[in-house]
């Protein structure tokens, strides 16, 4: 798929890695509507701080992204380098620096090498082409083992609207947009306020429902650019068109979010924690998230041990009131716990077979209300420890 008016490029800049793409560019041939959801961590990387300011007017023309260095916890020097990289690109593209969104991912606390940008901005711009989307997806990878892209089309008011999305992330994943990056482009005609209205709930139901290790990055961001090329009637708030657009955007973000979980560092299984019977959605989510972030639960899944006691124990510290002797817990369609008590050894043996699968659903019924939520996670393997122990070496 290609979206007319957008082009892409990626080069090997040697920022940290050798012989691999690590500097990417997404470019629109004219300023377009833009919106973002950025990390809510108090510790924010330089590009995040800059983008928060630049997104205020809801307009952008380019996204410049690098991997290998997060440019986080680098002080005023890091801010200055970030501004310089944008100015270098603006000069080469002959556009306003304020219309360039910046993004970085990689090691925290190390200075970003501005020379890598000075030497490579020109070839980066020269390499712009409408079919280089997946090269940028490769350039943003760090500990990812696969690139993550999604292509989607939907009919809005009788017009085909197209979406192209990419993401990176495998570790330091528990986004709270508010390390994980996602960029989506679309040819939908939509205002900046309406784009933000669609993005906020879509992120809440997708990227903010995943966790690999419970850590929130300094650099988390989702950026969306819409150029209006589909020439649909401009999408208005509260209309069917707005609902259709949000649904399509949420589809793309969910596809990318689940790919991040499936590619979690060292992961061998993707796990859905579904909590029902809660009094409120927030309580259901909190219980699900607490279980999903439990290291003991995640290692039990890796060991293919149907240790439901760890799940119930994690639920008990979620800060949500419930009666333990009303809780049911199932792995897939196998009930292990009914009214807070073990069903029996034969049920555990059957559940153990389910744990050998690559995708597992844990169903928890609190029997306190009618609200349900899901959180998506993965297991903790020996490789997770190795990957993170060796990350900077």
UniProtKB/Swiss-Prot annotation:
Q: Where in the cell is it found?
A: Cytoplasm
Specify the domain of life of the species encoding this protein. Bacteria
| Residue(s) at site: Cleavage | 178-179
Q: Name one GO biological process term.
A: L-arginine biosynthetic process
Q: Hey, where's the site called Involved in the stabilization of negative charge on the oxyanion by the formation of the oxyanion hole on this chain? A: 105-106
Q: Name one Pfam family in it.
A: ArgJ
Q: Which InterPro entries match?
A: Arg_biosynth_ArgJ, ArgJ-like_dom_sf, ArgJ_beta_C
What NCBIfam families does its record include?
A: ArgJ, PRK05388.1
Kindly provide the name given to this protein in its UniProt entry.
Answer: Arginine biosynthesis bifunctional protein ArgJ
Organism per entry = Desulfotalea psychrophila (strain LSv54 / DSM 12343)
Gene name in the database record: argJ
């Amino acid at each position: 798929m290609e979206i007319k008016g957008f082009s892409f490029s990626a080069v090997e800049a040697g920022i940290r890695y050798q012989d691999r793409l690590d500097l990417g560019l997404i470019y629109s041939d004219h300023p377009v509507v833009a919106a973002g959801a950025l990390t809510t961590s108090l510790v924010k990387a330089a590009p995040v701080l800059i983008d928060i300011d630049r997104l205020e007017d809801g307009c952008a023309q380019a996204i410049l992204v690098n991997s290998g260095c997060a440019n986080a916890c680098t002080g005023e020097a890091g801010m200055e380098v970030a501004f310089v990289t944008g100015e270098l690109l603006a000069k080469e593209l002959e556009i306003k620096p304020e219309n360039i969104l910046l993004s970085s991912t990689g090691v925290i606390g190390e200075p970003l090498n501005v020379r890598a940008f000075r030497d490579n901005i020109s070839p980066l711009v020269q390499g712009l082409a409408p079919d280089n989307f997946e090269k940028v997806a490769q350039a943003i990878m760090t500990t990812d083992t696969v690139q993550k892209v999604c292509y989607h089309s939907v009919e809005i008011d009788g017009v085909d609207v197209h979406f192209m999305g990419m993401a990176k992330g495998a570790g330091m994943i528990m986004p709270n947009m508010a390390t994980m990056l996602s960029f989506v482009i679309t040819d939908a005609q939509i205002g900046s306020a309406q784009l933000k209205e669609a993005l906020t709930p879509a992120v809440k139901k997708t990227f903010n429902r995943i966790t690999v290790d419970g850590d929130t990055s300094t650099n988390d961001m989702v950026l969306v650019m819409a150029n209006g090329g589909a020439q649909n009637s401009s999408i208005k708030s509260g209309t069917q068109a707005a609902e259709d657009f949000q649904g399509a955007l949420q589809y793309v973000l969910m596809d990318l979010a689940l790919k991040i979980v499936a590619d979690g560092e060292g992961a061998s299984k993707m796990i859905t924690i579904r909590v029902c019977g809660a009094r409120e959605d927030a309580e259901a989510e909190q219980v699900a998230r607490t279980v999903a972030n439990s290291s003991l639960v995640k290692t039990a899944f890796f060991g293919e041990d149907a240790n439901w006691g760890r799940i119930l124990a994690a639920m008990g510290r979620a800060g949500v009131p419930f009666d333990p002797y009303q809780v049911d817990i199932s792995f897939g369609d196998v009930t292990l716990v009914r009214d807070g008590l073990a069903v029996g050894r034969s049920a555990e043996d059957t559940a153990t077979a389910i744990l050998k699968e690559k995708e597992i659903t844990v169903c928890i019924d609190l029997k306190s209300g009618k609200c349900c939520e899901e959180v998506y996670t993965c297991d903790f393997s020996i490789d997770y420890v190795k990957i993170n122990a060796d990350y900077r070496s």
